[in-house]
Structures are given as C-alpha cells and as structure tokens.
Amino acid sequence: MLIRNYRKNIGLMAGVEFFAFLGITSFWILFLSQNGMSLWQIGLLESIFHTTSLLCEIPSGMLADRYSYKTNLYLSRIAGIVSSILMLAGQGNFWIYALAMAISALSYNFDSGTSAAMVYDSAVEAGLKERYLSISSFLSGVSEGTQSLGTVLAGFFVHGQLHLTYYIMIATSIIV
C-alpha cells in the first residue's frame, strides 16, 4: 500500500506542476506599468523579489527538512495567493507591490527544490530510483509547457485586463 502512495505522489506532482506554474502572471511588468509604476520602480520591485529569494532560499529548505515537503508546498501556494491578492489590492501603491513581490519570492522559495526532493524520495521508496531522471524530465516538461501556455493565455489580457491573470492565479493555487 505504501508503494502505491509513493507512486501516487509522482502523479500528483505533475498536477501540481501544471497548476502551480501556469505562468499566467508572466506579464507582471506590464501590469505594474499599467498601474502607474515607473521603470525605475519596477526595477526596484524586481530587486526586492530577488533579494528576498536570495536571503530565504536556505531557510525555506530547512523548513522542508524540519517539517515536510507537503507543508512547504502548502506554504508556497498560500504565499502565491497572498501575493496575488496584494498585487490586485496595490492600485499603484509601491509599498503594497513591494510586499507582494517579497511574498511572491517566498512562494518560489518554498517550492524550489521541494518538488524535486519529494519526487526523488517518492521514486526511491516506490522502487523507481532508476527511472528518476525520466520522471524528473517529464515533470520539467510539464512545468515548461504550462509556463508557455500561461504566457499565451495572459497575452489575451494585455489590453487593460491583466488583473484577471491574478484572479486566475489565485484559482489555480486553490486547485493545487
């Protein structure tokens, strides 16, 4: 029975990759620009994202080791939802967007490496260690494909409707 559960984890991760990395908010720079942010402010917001990510990558990995992969994945989705809500609520307020970017970085940090580690451990426990690279490649393909799909879908919203992409992001995060 446990082996089936570990095999199930691998399949579930494909669904998680699909919904969690849809890429629907890929036009966030245009969104911020449409909401009154200058290029300088957008660059600063990007810096906040990457600085937060740099500072929190190792601590977020320690949380996964301390608690569980599942907990980190839940935290990732919750942070993604909160970040999207803040982006919608920002209405041109730099500081709200800054908080949203920091929380978005945490969302990526909580997922970064956690999915791969969970899939690897599940493959080992299910007796599929020798197939891990092909499983990992498949999941990477799902992730890349859905990011591309999300970008194409977001393209339909670029003329003043980019806020809808954050609602879609919230919905897909809830599904996950």
Please provide the spans of the model-predicted regions.
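Residue-level signature of mid-helix packing/kink "hotspots" within the transmembrane helices
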Residues: 50-58, 144-148, 152
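Helical-face signature of the major facilitator-like transporter fold
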Residues: 13-21, 92-105
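Helix-loop boundary and gating motifs at the non-cytosolic
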Residues: 2-55
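C-terminal ends and interior cores of transmembrane alpha-helices
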Residues: 78-92, 97-98
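Helix-to-loop junctions at the C-terminal end of transmembrane segments
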Residues: 56-68, 158
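Transmembrane alpha-helix termini and helix-breaking/packing motifs in multi-pass membrane transporters
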Residues: 34, 87-88, 147-169
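Cytoplasmic helix-loop-helix junction between adjacent transmembrane helices
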Residues: 101-143
